[in-house]
Amino acid sequence: MVILSLYLAAFTLRLLLAGLAHKHCRDAPDGAACHYFTSAERSEWRTEDPQFLAEVLFAVTSMLSFTRLASILPAHESLGTLQISMGRMIDDMIRFMFILMIILTAFLCGLNNIYVPYQETERLGNFNETFQFLFWTMFGMEEHSVVDMPQFLVPEFVGRALYGIFTIVMVIVLLNMLIAMITNSFQKIEDAADVEWKFARSKLYLSYFREGLTLPVPFNILPSPKAIFYLLRRVFRFICCCHFCCKTKKPDYPPIPTFANPGAGAGPGEGERGSYRLRVIKALVQRYIETAQREFEETRRKDLGNRLTELTKTVSRLQSEVAGVQRAVVEAGPRRPPGGASVLSRYITRVRNSFQNLGPPIPETPELTVPATVGTQESSEIGLPDAGGAQAPASGESGPSSPAHVLVHREQESEGAGDLPQEADLGAKEGT
């Protein structure tokens, strides 16, 4: 709306200039006014000439028109964030300008009052020139020799001192402070870039959803019947609210007593006020509890995820260690003694031989069983069938080392030696 108003003002001034030229030339074609508005040179124009004002307004409005293209930047994620950051920086600069203008004005008055009586330099002694000199000094675009006056020592010393203090305060302190403020604002926007961009994008979308104009630009500056209707409705509502509604309107909630008005809540509305306050307090407490629960759940979920990650790493490490141990066992393998049989196999062979050499028969005894693991290992080492293959003879069955086998063997020997004398038999028994 501001841009359209400026365009309208620029075109109005041009029309006014044409109307004035037509009027003066019609009344006095050879007059000075007609000559001024029709054929005078630009250098002869007055400062307040409408043509100057129209050109200035048109130039400023053209600049503002092109800057309006930045209004669609929030539609893009990166450009929208940059636009928001630039807006915050401009706000910081505007707030900073108040301090800067106070200090700049103070030094401007001091330097101008020192150099006014002397007129030794063209850059100092004049208010406008001194302001320009100090302004461009902040950006390092002025020479420090401007403040020199060799023939006046005291004013020169004071002028140099003020100029040095101004340089320290403005260039070193305030400009660096401004840079720090701008950096802080930019960092805040970057920290919440996603939220800021989505909010700006939503504002852009809502600006297109709202009710638009009846006529397109630039015809929307002309009043339409709808605009007249809206104006009348707004005036009618304003009058009604001021004279009728405001007198009878009741507050949405009962008053709360304060120190200035302790009896505000007393009366018939005390119960309503109390119930309203209870509802508000309950809503606030519920909101706080829900927020705390969400934060607690999020923290617990993060802790659980961290613990699961650590447990997974531990299990993976244990699996790697077990696999390494298994590989080492497989590569090493079982080692056999140099005699060809283990100690246990030699012991079993010796016991079997001792049973075979027994003379008298011995009663049957239950067979000694070897654990499956040991039997399997030893059978694999000495070449015997393990427990899963051939089973050992049970008690009462004949085997090469069982007591029944030994008894039968002894009976056969006694039958074969039946022709021996009885004394030899008795001696053999006693020897046995």
Swiss-Prot record:
Entry similarity comment: Belongs to the transient receptor (TC 1.A.4) family. STrpC subfamily. TRPC2 sub-subfamily.
Gene Ontology terms, MF aspect: inositol 1,4,5 trisphosphate binding; store-operated calcium channel activity
The keyword Ion transport is assigned to this record: yes
Residue stretches spanning the membrane: 1-21, 52-72, 96-116, 162-182
Subcellular location, principal: membrane
Location of the protein in the cell: Membrane
UniProt superkingdom: Eukaryota
A Pfam family per the record: Ion_trans
Functional description taken from the UniProt entry: Thought to form a receptor-activated calcium permeant cation channel.
Keywords from the named record: Calcium, Calcium channel, Calcium transport, Ion channel, Ion transport, Membrane, Transmembrane, Transmembrane helix, Transport
PANTHER family linked: SHORT TRANSIENT RECEPTOR POTENTIAL CHANNEL 2, TRANSIENT RECEPTOR POTENTIAL CHANNEL
Name this polypeptide is given: Short transient receptor potential channel 2 homolog
Composition bias type Low complexity, residue spans: 387-404
GO CC terms, sorted: cation channel complex; plasma membrane
Single GO biological process annotation from the record: regulation of cytosolic calcium ion concentration
Bilayer topology: Multi-pass membrane protein
Region (Disordered): 356-432
Cited InterPro entries: Ion_trans_dom, TRPC2_channel, TRPC_channel
